[in-house]
Amino acid sequence: NNWLIRQEIIVDDVTVANKKANDILTKGVNSLGFHVEETHITPENMAALLKDIDVENIEINFHTCIKNAAKLIETTGAYYKSIHVDTTKAKGSFNYDPFKRMLKRGRDFANYATQAASLIKSASELLPKFRVVSVDAVMFNNAGSYISQELGYALAWGNEWLSALTEAGLSVDEAAKQIEFNFGISSNYFMEIAKFRAARMLWAQIVTAYKPECNCSTKMKTHAQTSEFNMTVYDAHVNLLRSQTETMSAALSGVDSITVTPFDITYKTPDDFSERIARNQQLLLKEESHFDKIVDPGAGSYYVENLTISIAEQAWKLFLETEDKGGFYQAVKDGYIQDQINASSVARHAAIARRKEILLGSNQYPNFNETAAGKIEKQDSC
């Protein structure tokens, strides 16, 4: 499984972001995640941001506010055309996700299907290998969900996209190939391996139910990101141990790309050192452990196979419960999904407080002499 090594870049200045992107591309990264604001989405800024980047061979992923999505697709497509890129080779994503706003802030976005269908049609003409819509299940993971919840609600989320986009006039093949799943990775090593294996199996069943013309449409495109829920301010270097095993889980389970969250993100803006360590954690697995040379090593393992079936059953049960409530959109609108995730978060925090869930360096072998107040970076509040 030769997964892509992705690093996220928060774009404050396009020239600085471009310099950073070109630098990290020489250090093992082959997938970039640009987080852009509306002011950055102009022909001039796009040219400056992607200057000297081989966009035919480097995966380019964008994150922006949903209101900027159409402008971003148009501007990116125009830039690729201006430099004569073979768009049948250029890959990436735009991560259009109106549900995230509903989940976080309760703001409804009723015409999401029409808007998404329009964006997909536009992107299909300009950048046919880019995926437009996303399922950001990583937010469930970071909020403290259990593994079965993250998977079950992610499947319901993906099914909501399939249903809405086919009703908006797209074929199931067109719709399925536009969805990218962004999962989190917790420290539960074998269960995370099983989760990704179960995800591919269940998603294939869901897409098959829509009767696609090509079996290739049942393939799940997955990006994995190490969890922020278990990252601590105290004894922060222990975060490296957690993120390393999390990355191993994702790599062994066959995801398409991985982002390792820098170990110091809980108390400061990650610097060059922590970002370099995060990159090297993946390079260690590829270049020294050769995890990219094997295919599904968990296959045939009694333990992993049984975990896969167990998680699949639990996740499928949650998927059906969500569908019974009217689908993912209605469940989010009613606050059902939020209530379930919040309840799990409260339960997990209580378990950590009682040492029923172990967090190394915090409730297990803590450093009692450490003080953290001095290293927390002050940030302006809105």
Cite the ranges covered by each PLM segment.
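Short glycine/threonine-rich loop-to-helix capping motif typified by GTGT followed
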Residues: 145-151, 186-198, 227-240, 268-278, ...
